[in-house]
Amino acid sequence: MKAYSVILGIVAACTAFSSAWARPATHSEWDNDDADSTVAVIAWFNKRDTMTYWINESSWKVKDGDTTKTSGVSTKVMLTVTDSTKKGYNMEYKFLDFQGDTLADSKIGEFQNTLVNKLSKDIVGTSIRFRTDEYGHITKYENLKEIKTQAKELFDSAYEELLKQPVMDSLKSVGIDITTLIKKADIATIVDGYTEELEMMFRFHGNSFTVGEYDDHSDETKKEYASDSHLSIDLDPETMEYSISTTVETKIPSKDIKELVGYIVETFSDDSKSEDFSDEYDKQVKEDAIVSSWNSWKYFADGWPSEVLSQTETMLMGQGKLKQTFIAWETRSVGNPEK
């Protein structure tokens, strides 16, 4: 097994949201003298407003310019405003449907489809209740205790299913036991998986931006790698719909990748395997990794998100992985009269 094939997923996970700290020209202004040059992400919602969305999560293997889809799952959700006050909104986020991707060509894709078929019936109908301020910024989740209980049960079921997979025996045969790592999983992180896309949709509510194009460079620090970023803010003067998009390119030194992955290898393998990894890495990896992130948000004039895209490509030695989350609205019922 080539060393760089092992580490691509780990690097992607560690840098997926690197654009969060690389946003130039972000500010908070509510009195805009020139509406044509500023967009404010503000929720103009009403009680009983309802939006449904499809969340499509996919991953691809990239090699020499060719891509092969390895996994995919689609989730249908519904957002409803249950109450509207001067101080903000009470809202509900409900899971309606889950679909696997039969075209995904990998063991991971097969396993993911197995989990979707087995566990989706336990999640469909689950609702997360939350509050926002008057601008639509999420301030509180009301029922995470219930979600935590469900998440723990689903994680245990997924773990049992994972143990049945042939790959587990293959890993053990070469001295690798990932069950140690899995048992250390943080349940809070699993709960975050329920709200991750919801947070993405409301990420910028409560902020305003100046229309235009912006470039920025960040030098390497003790906490962050050097990166180049681009921010684009667009406003349609006819519909007053608007969009925010960012691109970030980060270079991760080969020595840092080796240190990170070496630590993980040591966690669930013996000393000989750690030495083998180190030797193979030095022989094969001669370049730094490049992580490219693309993120975009499109909004209706009333502040409801219409599309959200988050995509990260991690490349090392001519091959890599591409992960994408794409959220698109399906039905829209807004401005309903109070009853």
Task: Give the positions of each predicted feature.
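Bacterial Sec-dependent N-terminal signal peptides
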Residues: 1-30
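Signature of exported/secreted
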Residues: 23-339
